[in-house]
Amino acid sequence: MDLLFGRRKTPEELLRQNQRALNRAMRELDRERQKLETQEKKIIADIKKMAKQGQMDAVRIMAKDLVRTRRYVRKFVLMRANIQAVSLKIQTLKSNNSMAQAMKGVTKAMGTMNRQLKLPQIQKIMMEFERQAEIMDMKEEMMNDAIDDAMGDEEDEEESDAVVSQVLDELGLSLTDELSNLPSTGGSLSVAAGGKKAEAAASALADADADLEERLKNLRRD
Protein backbone atom coordinates (compact mmCIF):
# COMPACT_ATOMS: atom_id res chain seq x y z
CA MET A 1 0.00 0.00 0.00
CA ASP A 2 1.16 3.50 -0.80
CA LEU A 3 -0.61 5.01 2.22
CA LEU A 4 0.75 4.99 5.77
CA PHE A 5 -1.52 6.16 8.62
CA GLY A 6 -3.77 7.99 6.17
CA ARG A 7 -0.97 9.72 4.30
CA ARG A 8 0.97 8.88 1.19
CA LYS A 9 4.36 7.30 1.73
CA THR A 10 7.44 9.24 0.78
CA PRO A 11 9.90 7.86 -1.80
CA GLU A 12 12.35 7.11 1.03
CA GLU A 13 9.74 5.04 2.88
CA LEU A 14 8.84 3.12 -0.28
CA LEU A 15 12.50 2.36 -0.95
CA ARG A 16 13.00 1.11 2.61
CA GLN A 17 9.89 -1.06 2.33
CA ASN A 18 11.06 -2.64 -0.93
CA GLN A 19 14.54 -3.09 0.50
CA ARG A 20 13.16 -5.04 3.45
CA ALA A 21 11.07 -7.22 1.13
CA LEU A 22 14.09 -8.04 -1.02
CA ASN A 23 16.22 -8.90 2.01
CA ARG A 24 13.48 -11.18 3.29
CA ALA A 25 13.26 -12.94 -0.10
CA MET A 26 17.04 -13.49 -0.15
CA ARG A 27 16.95 -15.05 3.31
CA GLU A 28 14.17 -17.44 2.22
CA LEU A 29 16.11 -18.43 -0.90
CA ASP A 30 19.20 -19.12 1.22
CA ARG A 31 17.20 -21.41 3.50
CA GLU A 32 15.72 -23.33 0.57
CA ARG A 33 19.12 -23.68 -1.08
CA GLN A 34 20.61 -25.07 2.12
CA LYS A 35 17.78 -27.63 2.32
CA LEU A 36 18.41 -28.71 -1.28
CA GLU A 37 22.17 -29.02 -0.67
CA THR A 38 21.47 -31.23 2.36
CA GLN A 39 19.08 -33.31 0.25
CA GLU A 40 21.73 -33.58 -2.48
CA LYS A 41 24.23 -35.05 -0.03
CA LYS A 42 21.63 -37.57 1.16
CA ILE A 43 20.78 -38.63 -2.42
CA ILE A 44 24.46 -39.17 -3.21
CA ALA A 45 24.83 -41.35 -0.12
CA ASP A 46 21.72 -43.38 -1.09
CA ILE A 47 22.98 -43.83 -4.67
CA LYS A 48 26.27 -45.24 -3.37
CA LYS A 49 24.40 -47.56 -1.02
CA MET A 50 22.05 -48.87 -3.74
CA ALA A 51 24.94 -49.29 -6.18
CA LYS A 52 26.76 -51.49 -3.66
CA GLN A 53 23.62 -53.57 -3.31
CA GLY A 54 23.29 -53.88 -7.09
CA GLN A 55 19.89 -52.15 -7.30
CA MET A 56 20.60 -50.29 -10.51
CA ASP A 57 16.97 -49.34 -11.25
CA ALA A 58 16.78 -47.44 -7.97
CA VAL A 59 20.18 -45.90 -8.71
CA ARG A 60 18.91 -44.54 -12.07
CA ILE A 61 15.80 -43.03 -10.46
CA MET A 62 17.81 -41.39 -7.66
CA ALA A 63 20.33 -40.10 -10.21
CA LYS A 64 17.53 -38.24 -12.02
CA ASP A 65 16.39 -36.86 -8.66
CA LEU A 66 19.96 -35.71 -7.97
CA VAL A 67 20.12 -33.90 -11.32
CA ARG A 68 16.82 -32.09 -10.61
CA THR A 69 18.00 -31.15 -7.13
CA ARG A 70 21.24 -29.68 -8.42
CA ARG A 71 19.30 -27.76 -11.09
CA TYR A 72 17.07 -26.22 -8.39
CA VAL A 73 20.13 -25.26 -6.36
CA ARG A 74 21.57 -23.41 -9.35
CA LYS A 75 18.22 -21.68 -9.94
CA PHE A 76 18.06 -20.53 -6.32
CA VAL A 77 21.61 -19.20 -6.52
CA LEU A 78 20.77 -17.31 -9.73
CA MET A 79 17.53 -15.93 -8.26
CA ARG A 80 19.34 -14.73 -5.16
CA ALA A 81 21.98 -13.01 -7.31
CA ASN A 82 19.27 -11.19 -9.29
CA ILE A 83 17.46 -10.10 -6.14
CA GLN A 84 20.73 -8.90 -4.65
CA ALA A 85 21.40 -6.84 -7.80
CA VAL A 86 17.98 -5.20 -7.47
CA SER A 87 18.68 -4.54 -3.78
CA LEU A 88 21.94 -2.83 -4.68
CA LYS A 89 20.12 -0.68 -7.23
CA ILE A 90 17.61 0.36 -4.59
CA GLN A 91 20.45 1.19 -2.20
CA THR A 92 22.04 3.29 -4.95
CA LEU A 93 18.74 5.12 -5.47
CA LYS A 94 18.53 5.83 -1.75
CA SER A 95 22.07 7.18 -1.72
CA ASN A 96 21.43 9.34 -4.78
CA ASN A 97 18.22 10.65 -3.26
CA SER A 98 20.00 11.48 0.01
CA MET A 99 22.72 13.28 -1.92
CA ALA A 100 20.11 15.20 -3.94
CA GLN A 101 18.34 16.29 -0.75
CA ALA A 102 21.63 17.39 0.77
CA MET A 103 22.56 19.34 -2.37
CA LYS A 104 19.12 20.94 -2.35
CA GLY A 105 19.64 22.13 1.22
CA VAL A 106 23.13 23.41 0.46
CA THR A 107 21.91 25.24 -2.65
CA LYS A 108 19.13 26.88 -0.67
CA ALA A 109 21.57 27.97 2.05
CA MET A 110 23.99 29.36 -0.54
CA GLY A 111 21.18 31.32 -2.19
CA THR A 112 20.18 32.81 1.15
CA MET A 113 23.76 33.81 1.91
CA ASN A 114 24.21 35.37 -1.53
CA ARG A 115 21.07 37.44 -1.04
CA GLN A 116 22.29 38.62 2.36
CA LEU A 117 25.80 39.49 1.18
CA LYS A 118 25.35 42.76 -0.72
CA LEU A 119 28.50 43.89 -2.50
CA PRO A 120 28.04 47.68 -2.08
CA GLN A 121 27.60 47.32 1.67
CA ILE A 122 30.67 45.09 1.91
CA GLN A 123 32.72 47.61 -0.09
CA LYS A 124 31.52 50.43 2.16
CA ILE A 125 32.45 48.45 5.27
CA MET A 126 35.91 47.69 3.89
CA MET A 127 36.51 51.35 2.99
CA GLU A 128 35.47 52.46 6.47
CA PHE A 129 37.73 49.81 7.98
CA GLU A 130 40.70 51.05 5.95
CA ARG A 131 39.97 54.65 6.94
CA GLN A 132 39.77 53.82 10.63
CA ALA A 133 42.95 51.75 10.35
CA GLU A 134 44.78 54.71 8.79
CA ILE A 135 43.55 57.02 11.56
CA MET A 136 44.72 54.55 14.17
CA ASP A 137 48.14 54.28 12.51
CA MET A 138 48.47 58.08 12.41
CA LYS A 139 47.54 58.43 16.08
CA GLU A 140 49.95 55.68 17.04
CA GLU A 141 52.74 57.36 15.06
CA MET A 142 52.02 60.74 16.71
CA MET A 143 52.08 59.15 20.17
CA ASN A 144 55.35 57.41 19.40
CA ASP A 145 56.87 60.68 18.18
CA ALA A 146 55.69 62.48 21.32
CA ILE A 147 57.15 59.79 23.54
CA ASP A 148 60.42 59.87 21.60
CA ASP A 149 60.58 63.67 21.95
CA ALA A 150 59.89 63.48 25.67
CA MET A 151 62.33 60.68 26.37
CA GLY A 152 64.92 61.27 23.68
CA ASP A 153 67.17 63.81 25.49
CA GLU A 154 67.27 61.79 28.66
CA GLU A 155 68.05 58.62 26.76
CA ASP A 156 70.76 60.37 24.74
CA GLU A 157 72.33 61.74 27.92
CA GLU A 158 72.23 58.33 29.57
CA GLU A 159 73.80 56.73 26.51
CA SER A 160 76.49 59.42 26.41
CA ASP A 161 77.31 58.90 30.09
CA ALA A 162 77.47 55.16 29.50
CA VAL A 163 79.91 55.62 26.60
CA VAL A 164 82.13 57.97 28.63
CA SER A 165 82.13 55.58 31.57
CA GLN A 166 83.02 52.66 29.31
CA VAL A 167 85.93 54.56 27.74
CA LEU A 168 87.28 55.65 31.11
CA ASP A 169 86.95 52.11 32.46
CA GLU A 170 88.96 50.81 29.54
CA LEU A 171 91.64 53.44 30.29
CA GLY A 172 91.63 52.58 33.97
CA LEU A 173 90.36 56.00 34.99
CA SER A 174 87.27 57.32 36.68
CA LEU A 175 85.03 60.22 35.76
CA THR A 176 85.76 61.93 39.10
CA ASP A 177 89.50 61.81 38.50
CA GLU A 178 89.11 63.30 35.03
CA LEU A 179 86.97 66.15 36.25
CA SER A 180 89.40 66.93 39.08
CA ASN A 181 92.31 67.05 36.62
CA LEU A 182 90.69 69.61 34.33
CA PRO A 183 92.79 72.83 34.11
CA SER A 184 91.47 75.91 35.86
CA THR A 185 90.47 79.03 33.88
CA GLY A 186 92.86 81.31 35.70
CA GLY A 187 91.09 82.06 38.92
CA SER A 188 87.59 82.32 40.18
CA LEU A 189 84.95 84.17 38.27
CA SER A 190 84.40 87.72 39.41
CA VAL A 191 81.23 88.69 41.18
CA ALA A 192 80.48 91.25 38.50
CA ALA A 193 80.71 88.70 35.72
CA GLY A 194 78.51 86.32 37.68
CA GLY A 195 76.02 89.10 38.32
CA LYS A 196 75.86 89.99 34.64
CA LYS A 197 75.16 86.39 33.68
CA ALA A 198 72.43 86.14 36.30
CA GLU A 199 70.84 89.37 35.07
CA ALA A 200 70.94 88.12 31.48
CA ALA A 201 69.30 84.83 32.45
CA ALA A 202 66.59 86.65 34.41
CA SER A 203 65.92 88.99 31.49
CA ALA A 204 65.59 86.08 29.06
CA LEU A 205 63.19 84.32 31.42
CA ALA A 206 61.08 87.49 31.76
CA ASP A 207 60.93 87.88 27.99
CA ALA A 208 59.77 84.27 27.62
CA ASP A 209 57.05 84.80 30.24
CA ALA A 210 55.86 87.96 28.53
CA ASP A 211 55.71 86.23 25.16
CA LEU A 212 53.70 83.35 26.63
CA GLU A 213 51.29 85.77 28.32
CA GLU A 214 50.78 87.63 25.04
CA ARG A 215 49.92 84.37 23.23
CA LEU A 216 47.38 83.45 25.90
CA LYS A 217 45.70 86.87 25.54
CA ASN A 218 45.48 86.42 21.78
CA LEU A 219 43.89 83.00 22.23
CA ARG A 220 41.28 84.43 24.63
CA ARG A 221 40.37 87.18 22.13
CA ASP A 222 39.98 84.60 19.34
From Swiss-Prot:
ISGylated in a CHMP5-dependent manner. Isgylation weakens and inhibits its interactions with VPS4A and VTA1 respectively. Residues 56-222 are annotated as: Interaction with VPS4B. One of its GO terms (cellular component) is multivesicular body membrane. It is a peripheral membrane protein. Gene3D superfamilies: 6.10.140.1230. InterPro entries: Snf7_fam. Keywords: Acetylation, Coiled coil, Endosome, Host-virus interaction, Membrane, Nucleus, Phosphoprotein, Protein transport, Transport, Ubl conjugation. Its main location: membrane. The modification Phosphothreonine is found at T185. It is found in: Late endosome membrane; Nucleus envelope. The modification Phosphoserine is found at S184, S188, S190, S203. Residues 217-222 are annotated as: Interaction with VTA1. The keyword Thylakoid does not apply. Residues 12-53, 195-222 form a coiled coil. One of its GO terms (biological process) is establishment of protein localization. GO terms for molecular function: phosphatidylcholine binding; protein domain specific binding. The modification N-acetylmethionine is found at M1. A motif (MIT-interacting motif) lies at residues 210-220. Probable core component of the endosomal sorting required for transport complex III (ESCRT-III) which is involved in multivesicular bodies (MVBs) formation and sorting of endosomal cargo proteins into MVBs. MVBs contain intraluminal vesicles (ILVs) that are generated by invagination and scission from the limiting membrane of the endosome and mostly are delivered to lysosomes enabling degradation of membrane proteins, such as stimulated growth factor receptors, lysosomal enzymes and lipids. The MVB pathway appears to require the sequential function of ESCRT-O, -I,-II and -III complexes. (Microbial infection) The ESCRT machinery functions in topologically equivalent membrane fission events, such as the budding of enveloped viruses (HIV-1 and other lentiviruses). Involved in HIV-1 p6- and p9-dependent virus release. Its overexpression strongly inhibits HIV-1 release. The acidic C-terminus and the basic N-termminus are thought to render the protein in a closed, soluble and inactive conformation through an autoinhibitory intramolecular interaction. The open and active conformation, which enables membrane binding and oligomerization, is achieved by interaction with other cellular binding partners, probably including other ESCRT components. Probable core component of the endosomal sorting required for transport complex III (ESCRT-III). ESCRT-III components are thought to multimerize to form a flat lattice on the perimeter membrane of the endosome. Several assembly forms of ESCRT-III may exist that interact and act sequentially. In vitro, heteromerizes with CHMP3 (but not CHMP4) to form helical tubular structures that expose membrane-interacting sites on the outside whereas VPS4B can associate on the inside of the tubule. Interacts with CHMP1B, CHMP2B, CHMP3, CHMP4A, CHMP4B, CHMP4C and CHMP5. Belongs to the SNF7 family. This is Charged multivesicular body protein 2a. It comes from Homo sapiens. The lineage of its organism: Eukaryota, Metazoa, Chordata, Craniata, Vertebrata. The gene is CHMP2A.
